[in-house]
């Protein structure tokens, strides 16, 4: 792999960049300089594909472009119809669990999210091919496992499993059985990247450490419900933490490809990616809000999420767009499952520090993250007991 010119950093001197490279993640030596770099097939829009190296992936990131890495699909001879019409799901027309949700929501803790995120961002990077990326996944798995073990759910079939990939960082899936196999999914991605060079420090506090700890806290409080913990919800619930989102939604594509092959009955998928930055909205002179994505999502699920935000959050929503393949919900859509995405703000007001070493905890608003946790908790609880 060729190293991109350090001049691309612009704002950082080369000595600062080299100092930020972890000792166990040194650049490749000269003995490999003549090897041809591995290439990957990416899709930047429906039908718009190209072969690129991994360095070229990060160049696209620097340009603000998003994509699926569909190499595995080609190798397996399976290319799903892009954004097929999802199965018909009748989402509720109104909120039906207000008393239960509001009682549970009072137990959500900003302190828990802060403590988890402080630890999670202490890893040099969570780059999906790095040693630190595997270590961070192991740490996160332990937190999710402890969350489930500390609840009644562990006695009623709840489990936490790794979903292994061909690269070292695994995805994580927590499952809480319901009375049917119809499944409600909430996701976030656990990896991080420095778009200038993968070995450079990438704390990934907002992208997507914030979503990672937001849904972890929602899971903790959800399991305080005896009805959920004891398996009495109508539908099964899953919480996902995906690997390798930054490299082209690799982890989530692997998960939903497997689910499709197994004929899993996934009724909804909500992605929480970047939940912590509110200052961009305030600096623009606008009211604090959460951003409901309206492109490449399921309209019925998205409309119900708007009701959830209105009913359970203390701030309003705004409608915004993020483009093709912009986060892991797109993988669910790709395989025919209804999906939605709620981000921290209008897309243009979201954090500009992502994919750099400056995406750190100090710039995040944990009161804002609490609103995302309320929305996540409310949505999951409502859909867990709905006839979908």
UniProtKB/Swiss-Prot annotation:
It is found in: Secreted. GO terms for molecular function: aminopeptidase activity; metal ion binding; metalloexopeptidase activity. Its cofactor is Zn(2+). Its EC number is 3.4.11.-. Keywords: Aminopeptidase, Disulfide bond, Glycoprotein, Hydrolase, Metal-binding, Protease, Secreted, Signal, Zinc, Zymogen. One of its GO terms (biological process) is proteolysis. It holds the Pfam family Peptidase_M28. Residues 20-88 form a propeptide. Gene3D superfamilies: Zn peptidases (3.40.630.10). Zn(2+) 2 binds at residues 207, 246, 355. It is an enzyme of class 3 (hydrolase). Disulfide bonds join 322-326. Zn(2+) 1 binds at residues 189, 207, 273. Glycans are attached at residues 96, 119, 149, 164, 181, 232. Residues 1-19 form the signal peptide. Binds 2 Zn(2+) ions per subunit. One of its GO terms (cellular component) is extracellular region. Monomer. Extracellular aminopeptidase that allows assimilation of proteinaceous substrates. Belongs to the peptidase M28 family. M28E subfamily. This is Leucine aminopeptidase 1. The gene is LAP1.
